[in-house]
Amino acid sequence: VSGQYRQASENRLSTLCRELLVSVAHAENDVVLRTPPGAAQFLASAIDQARIEGVLGTIAGDDTILLITTGTEQATAISDLLLGYTR
């Protein structure tokens, strides 16, 4: 059941990234995600539910998400992962 839940969360995250993710930038262990107005909390919740390895947590405003990772390499990998979902 856990594997099915994780797959469903990843599928949902992929769909939401395609629809809502406007831009991604990272510095050190932080990743900043931009969304249309009003969508940041929705996308941040999907990221939290996906339980991506290396993500410590998210903070969402109206159109911006601060995603905190465990390190610089993880920030790069997670940025690439989320951008990959938009293609």
Name each model-derived stretch.
Residues 1-7:
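Minor-groove-contacting beta-hairpin "wing" of winged helix-turn-helix DNA-binding domains
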Residues 8-79, 83-85:
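Non-DNA-binding regulatory cores of transcription-related proteins
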